[in-house]
Structure formats: C-alpha cells, structure tokens
Amino acid sequence: MDVFSEYLAGIADPFHRERTEEVLTWIKNKYPNLHTEIKWNQPMFTDHGTFIIGFSVSKKHLAVAPEKVTIAHVEDDIVKAGYDYTEQLIRIPWNGPVDYTLLEKMIEFNILDKADCSTFWRK
C-alpha cells in the first residue's frame, strides 16, 4: 500500500481517508496479484498493464471507475446497492455502506474479460 500512502495522506477528511484506505486495502488483500498504481492522481489497480479499477475522492462520495462495459455488466447490482452512477463511474456515498460484493463482481469481471487485453483501456 506504500504506492497509495501519499495519495491517502492528501485526503483532508479523516473519515474519507479511512474509508478510502479500507477499500484499497481490501482490494489489495483480496487480489494480491493486481498492481497498485497512481495515474491521473487516482489510485488504481491494474493487471498485466491493463486497467482493472480506479477510485477518486470527492466531497460527497468515493467514486469508483471500472470502465463503462463493466458498469453495464453489473448495472442491476448497482441499482440494488442504491448507488448513484453514470456510464463511467459509480458513487459510493460517505454516509452509506460499501458493497464489497459489488466491488468483487466488477474486479473479477474485468480480470476475466480483459485477460487477453494488451492495452490499458478497452478499445
């Protein structure tokens, strides 16, 4: 998690920092083969050089960016979780629970779906 230390230290709100660290640590522990990176000032996880999932912090939520194909794949689960979303990101409100089952579903979908992907983003 050293890669994310500076990013986390820059999150002013202690609760937001703790929640973000909790999510990033959960992913790192659950998927130890994924690489941790900071790109575009966002913590993200990659696999063989291809993007798997990324995050950003805002005043009202933790934004999750798994790529739009993945959001379409899990759209029903996003609705069931009660999260607001666009075609590119999902908003997990700070005052609500993190649906780790949904995160797992998105990460596993991307790992499998992008197994043969040779680019950072899907084409």
Swiss-Prot record:
Cofactor note: Binds 1.0 Fe(2+) to 1.5 to 3.2 Fe(2+) per monomer.
Database matches in SUPFAM superfamilies: YdhG-like (SSF159888)
Species of the source: Bacillus subtilis (strain 168)
Cofactor requirements of the protein: Fe(2+)
GO biological process: iron ion transport
Superkingdom to which the source organism belongs: Bacteria
Recorded GO CC terms: cytoplasm
Keyword Metal-binding carried by entry: yes
General function of this protein: Plays an essential role in iron intracellular trafficking to iron cofactor biogenesis systems including iron-sulfur cluster (Fe-S) or heme assembly. Promotes the biosynthesis of iron-sulfur clusters by delivering Fe to the complex composed of the cysteine desulfurase SufS and the zinc-dependent sulfurtransferase SufU. Also plays a critical role in coproporphyrin-dependent heme b biogenesis and thus provides an essential function for the bacterial global metabolism.
Compartments, as annotated in UniProt: Cytoplasm
Chief site of localization: cytoplasm
Protein name, entry field: Intracellular iron chaperone frataxin
InterPro entries in UniProt: YdhG-like
Knocked-out gene: effects: Reduced growth in rich medium, unable to grow in minimal medium. Reduced activity of Fe-S-dependent aconitase (citB). Reactive oxygen species are drastically reduced. No bacillibactin (BB), an endogenous siderophore, produced. 20% higher intracellular iron concentrations.
Keyword field: Cytoplasm, Ion transport, Iron, Iron transport, Metal-binding, Transport
Pfam family, one: DUF1801
Molecular functions (GO terms): metal ion binding
Oligomer and partners: Homodimer, upon Fe(2+) binding. Interacts with the SufS/SufU complex. Interacts with CpfC.
